[in-house]
């Protein structure tokens, strides 16, 4: 399916999330990562989330992308054939319980590909 390049640069709605200790510990436990950094809440520095927890925080956008696209004329039929292809993360500091995150994004590219059109979100 061909998608118009007019959507490049379109901002997504912001996702707000306040991180809880339960979320970070559940994620660490579910992935089998038992490092004290993620569970020992008596550490002077407190606990932190595993680095890949960042993917879990952003996942609601991928899961409900239509809720985050503001353009009424974005072709909704492509959503039913979407595939999460790749993710690229940059870490500047650990995520900690109590952090209030605002996840923002935009359509940064629409690229033709032999297997279908790639919609790149940044």
Model-assigned labels for residue ranges:
Residues 1-84:
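Hot-dog-fold acyl-thioester-processing enzymes
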Residues 82-122:
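Hydrophobic beta-sheet segments that form the core/acyl-binding groove
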């Amino acid at each position: 399916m061909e998608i118009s390049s007019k959507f490049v640069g379109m901002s997504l709605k912001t996702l707000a999330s306040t991180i809880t200790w339960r979320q970070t510990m559940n994620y660490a436990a579910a992935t089998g990562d038992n490092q004290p950094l993620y569970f020992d809440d008596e550490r002077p520095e407190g606990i932190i989330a595993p680095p890949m927890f960042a993917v879990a925080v952003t996942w609601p956008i991928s899961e409900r992308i239509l809720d985050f696209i503001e353009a009424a004329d974005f072709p909704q039929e492509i959503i039913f054939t979407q595939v999460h292809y790749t993710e690229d993360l940059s870490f500047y500091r650990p995520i900690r319980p109590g952090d209030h995150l605002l996840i923002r994004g935009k359509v940064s590219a629409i690229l033709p590909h032999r297997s279908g059109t790639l919609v790149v979100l940044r």
